[in-house]
């Protein structure tokens, strides 16, 4: 199997199986640090990659509401001279009927003002994303990188907001995996992260951190503006940013999306879905299940009513 060289600013590459026809695929990368004194990744990394591959290769994942691309295969990538690049390449099949580069939600909001979605389309985008997060959590999986650049649309120009998929699984892991890997400190990414997860994290990642990130993206969808442009966040501490996002939600969302949607977003940002749930008492799985029940009722339930609007 031969994978074409990467192209700048594109995740699309061509893979040619031995004796087969070339196929365009969407590629994501998962870097790894070789074990000390060796060229191979750690056993924990190998297990993590296999587990993620098993999840994303499930043919029924899309039908179940995951809205993730189907993983074709995983390669340990090498450069043109055969040297290991210390990263895995996840090769995803493109959706049927897709053509050309997908567009991210981030790009759609910032660079396509003439293609603003209808009110009903905004509700549908929000519902599809919230359903993706719900389904991932239902199988005990954490995404860890929910932000608008990791939501892609593969639809044709006249149906721009169709064929929506959640990508960006570089840091994703099983909820029982206690590894800590997402340690960059960039405001454009931090603004989607819970305050506890900005900079070197000192708390274990949980479903509530994913749900907080979802709330930030839902705020962007509702106002159809990039959250980074709301005001000058540079220099604010993480808790102050969180407070400002909550204030923007309360003050601005009701006019654009209504009270139910606003309350759904605030449930995500306020972490109230965990009220009455104590992980230590019933174990991690019991805690997740309790949060899932509240999420279905208060977040998905708050969004679904607007999908039929035009």
Model-based region annotation:
Residues 62-70, 75-78, 83, 145, ...:
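Helical subdomain adjoining the active site within ATP-dependent kinase catalytic cores
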Residues 196-208:
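Conserved end of the kinase activation segment
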Residues 131-142:
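Protein kinase catalytic-loop region centered on the HRD/HxD motif
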Residues 69-121, 176-182, 187:
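Conserved structural core of kinase catalytic domains
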Residues 210, 214-215:
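Alpha-helical D-x4-[hydrophobic]G micro-motif in the C-lobe of protein kinase domains
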Residues 1-33, 63-69, 78:
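ATP-binding glycine-rich phosphate-binding loop
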Residues 147-196:
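Activation segment/activation loop of eukaryotic-type protein kinase catalytic domains
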